[in-house]
């Protein structure tokens, strides 16, 4: 019991540091221009394209375990199908990143403008949220989609995927962060947690 309490305390400290680092990353990310964010997104697309074989290898590990879960009734066949990555899904995923690159910067847009008095104008301007938490199941390609949109909109993100796709989730997080590091992007923008306890905290 004492050992379990120590482990829980250590995990709590690790999670606390992760969230603190994500908040700091969000502040840096909020001030980046569109060109810098697009360069990061392009680096992600290229790194995923370059490492497709590794992604499929990790995905196959998840699929092998998921087959047993389908047999035992712990997950459905439709969940298994969503978990599976193929060339078409990969191509669409990468194309989706380039589609986001083409979008205008959603940050610092004037949404409303009201003249209150002479030389006094009130503006409603779009800004990043900060740190976003997203929970998803089965579809590991969601990591790439959410990470892409988070970066474009100037937000850091904490992701919790389903345990059935843990190997695929981990490789996507690794490749995304590798790409971000290669262009000197702020660290700790994309973060992955693994348990419901982490999310509850």
Regions found by a protein language model. Name each.
Residues 2-6:
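Extreme N-terminal basic, low-complexity initiation segments
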Residues 102, 110-201:
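Rossmann-like NAD(P) dinucleotide-binding subdomain of oxidoreductase/dehydrogenase enzymes
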Residues 7-121:
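N-terminal Rossmann-like NAD(P)+-binding subdomain of aldehyde/semialdehyde dehydrogenases
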